[in-house]
């Protein structure tokens, strides 16, 4: 498990309990097949006989406004943190980078930083953003990043070599691959 050695992850650790393992095994007994919607899970299941394959998350594009940037507007950078996954998602790298960006470009940017918001509030809070800081340590973007990309935002997230190969895109063309 990728995590900071000096920090507890009680939210994640519940998935390692005997009770959760028993529940997981029950679900797997009752399922017909496994479908992955994310490249991060694809390698885990790819050799299983009951694995249907990878089907990317669908998104309804007409539900999003593709807001146009106005001239001479400050660049708005949004960083939304789920506190329980702060280290696992690599948010400390973004926080460190934002300190430098704030010092060098405070007159040209606006930062919006939020923590542990419910989904609807989270999505609404980044509406004016130009740049979204999503996560590191990932091969594929998460659903929030996918929705942000659908709105024409620049997203820093997982978009590595396997992402580019799978979706037949050039590196950093639809999302910026973020690695520590």
Question: What are the residue ranges of the model-derived segments?
Answer:
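Short hydrophobic beta-strand element within catalytic cores of glycosyltransferases
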Residues: 154-158
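Acidic anion/phosphate-binding donor-loop and adjacent secondary structure
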Residues: 43-74
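Short alpha-helical segment that forms part of, or immediately flanks, the ligand-binding pocket
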Residues: 123, 146-150, 164-165, 169
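Conserved donor-binding/catalytic core segment of Leloir-type glycosyltransferases
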Residues: 63, 68-89, 95
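Aromatic "clamp/platform" in nucleotide-sugar-dependent glycosyltransferases that forms part
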Residues: 137
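Membrane-proximal helix-turn-helix segments that form the acceptor-binding/catalytic region
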Residues: 4-34
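A short alpha->beta transition loop at the rim of the catalytic pocket in nucleotide-sugar-dependent
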Residues: 130, 152
């Amino acid at each position: 498990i990728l995590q900071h050695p000096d920090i507890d992850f009680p939210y994640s650790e519940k998935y390692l309990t005997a009770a959760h393992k028993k529940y997981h095994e029950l679900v797997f007994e009752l399922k017909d097949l496994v479908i992955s919607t994310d490249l991060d899970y694809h390698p885990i299941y790819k050799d299983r006989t009951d694995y249907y394959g990878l089907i990317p998350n669908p998104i309804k594009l007409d539900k999003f406004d593709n807001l146009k940037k106005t001239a001479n507007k400050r660049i708005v950078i949004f960083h939304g943190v789920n506190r329980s996954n702060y280290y696992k998602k690599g948010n400390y790298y973004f926080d460190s980078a934002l300190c430098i960006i704030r010092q060098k470009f405070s007159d040209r940017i606006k930062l919006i930083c939020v923590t542990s918001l419910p989904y609807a509030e989270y999505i609404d809070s980044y509406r004016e953003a130009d740049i979204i800081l999503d996560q590191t340590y990932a091969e594929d973007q998460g659903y929030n990043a996918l929705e942000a990309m659908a709105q024409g935002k620049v997203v820093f997230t997982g978009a590595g070599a396997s992402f580019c190969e799978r979706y037949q895109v050039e590196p950093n063309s639809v999302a910026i691959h973020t690695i520590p």
